[in-house]
């Protein structure tokens, strides 16, 4: 791709491929529409613009006259080792834009300046994004805030968690995770639709939600259960969130919005034995989590803990930001990859080759490794990526058939 093709003021979003709507026809209408498609395209382009801006802020261009790997750049620029993953993302985005070229010898990826970067115009793209949907401000604000922390995280021992979860950051996260923000809410809609489809034939519903945050995923799941006439079957819904502030926000909102439901709130750390945190074996028909499992320190441990909590033939359903192809950079990573909780995980070459977001194939392998012999991914993200490679949402579903009678 030539960098000239990325002229900011020539950026336009056309209409989505009709085949994409066909792939999503079984999901609620709120899941996807043209406004969301245009918003997603805008966010991808905006994140590339931020990468070009960071190229200058981090003084990368002057070091890329010769081939350099991310590790070499970290060394020569005295960046902290923890910044390597974020730096790799910036470099990959710049390859997409035509500013850099990349070579891969099988062990190391190296980069070199190919074209002079353009002058980024974030204000112009931001105005376009707000014109598409004023609610896009939530994602744009968080992208800007996260990018502004990159230089400090790169050059100091202060981690991204400290920068992004301070007083200003918390309000931005709450806005981002809100269901009014369609670019995030799609994760909640896809996860909830997949979960409800797998619960609809059960006479009694016992639900455990892990990492519920401020409750946007819980809200959509309860709404869909209500629309399908299933709330009367809800025998128990345990909403867990380790962050006390988010948990209080969750409880205040949902206890008022959904009266007379058997909702419970507690704290569960997915990296510690669940049985020691009040979660009994075989107690639930559904274990549910949206954009949580990818931060598990030991993914197989957490998946096995989830399976242990399930009744015979119960389902684990996780809504996840899914990477369409191996090594494909995607815009949501900009907000998360300077967080230690996102990057400080145990990797595995078979099913978790990198921290953060995984592909559908990698999730399937992880579920199978954890004993979920019946594993499904919805929608058909392998088909969708051939039509639209910027669709990043999927629900990975595994049934506890190993102990089913």
State each model region's role.
Residues 319-370, 374-380:
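C-terminal alpha-helical "lid/dimerization" subdomain adjacent to the S-adenosyl-L-methionine
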Residues 204, 234, 283-285:
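Local beta-strand N-terminus motif with an aromatic residue
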Residues 206-208, 212-273:
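Class I SAM-dependent methyltransferase SAM/SAH-binding core
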Residues 300-315:
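A short glycine-rich, Lys/Arg-flanked "PGG" loop and its adjoining helix->strand segment in the class I
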